[in-house]
């Protein structure tokens, strides 16, 4: 094995990388370049080329994008197995991954601090420490480390992206600063730096479009997305995700039929099974924004039927069918169709169980499986007014997630307890559960009910502000798709 140390004249000293092959290292570095363009397909392609040459390549096993859970676990297990054969940097990076997966966020931060202490001239080390802080919502510490990374290497496009992503919505499940602390001008400054570093890459133009979409300037967003699509086409990169983004913009601009054409195009152009499925999930949710529950269920059934033609493995088919049934359950439940909602809830659980049967189940997978079952069962009971049953499930959820170190581990439990107390007529008790983590940037669904509790307790100004943010939230997510129209109705009734 060779441990490659930097011979660069740059002030940015790459972390030492252990591999048996210079060619494998070249493929690995190409993968990271494409990751800077947010091209998961190319990242995966070149990481796997590196692994074809050197199957024991620690960091390639750790970072390769792989959507099949069994294959992904094989890669990560190989990284864990080999961590002591590499440099201390590689060991720390693997330890960070394990800690993050297990929810040991304090340990994750401490490992990252050691990485920075041992490799103070590596911009990547500071990005990794920033990421560890960001997960815990310690945004200022995260930003300080991202900025330090750009001080070391002004061309570290991943660091600029991290800085911009604190202020600008781009991806589902992205962690953003609370709306009151966001600075869109600063975010644009960071994204413009990305564009200057990678003018041929589509991602910067897409993010600029997202800024305009967030502000309700859908026509300006269209221009940015057109530029981004041209970049994708010119470089022969996958465009299905961007076609979905164009569709989102059309949904919020009231051009629903045109949006469906773009969703369909995104599915048909998907180069991977996951590309097709991801666009399909967004298409289901687009109907929920319009309270078209039957339309959402019709599309969900079609996508579920098509999954086997996408090229998924059996375990992925079951996992994805479970996610589709979750959306059907919520569509039925918000339409107050109890029998149908329960059927979809049980189908979701059944598909998840079948997926588990095809996986090597460790403690974390079992924990997450049990937590999801309790959470979704509680959700069902809440939406149909069965509050004692809901509390029983939430107590089960608490017994699972309270053992996780993460400061966000209790968020779903707390928010759902807040919903229970609200519907029981105890607005003050409800607000004691709706903590500061429940904000409109990261939990739009729960924020709607938090606003109802605030309104019931006489805090109308704060409640109205939350309703307004949700009603004008122009991004496609499951939770917000269920409450955006409800927030609009609250504003109209005042």
Task: Enumerate the language-model features and the residues they cover.
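Alpha-solenoid helical repeat scaffolds
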Residues: 28, 59-63, 91-94, 124-128, ...
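TPR-repeat structural position
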Residues: 40-41, 105, 139, 173, ...
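Alpha-helical adaptor scaffolds
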Residues: 93, 97-101, 165-169, 402-440
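Solenoid-like repeat scaffolds
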Residues: 48-53, 80-86, 113-120, 151-152, ...
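Alpha-helical segment of the N-proximal tetratricopeptide repeat
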Residues: 20-49, 53, 91-114, 118-124, ...
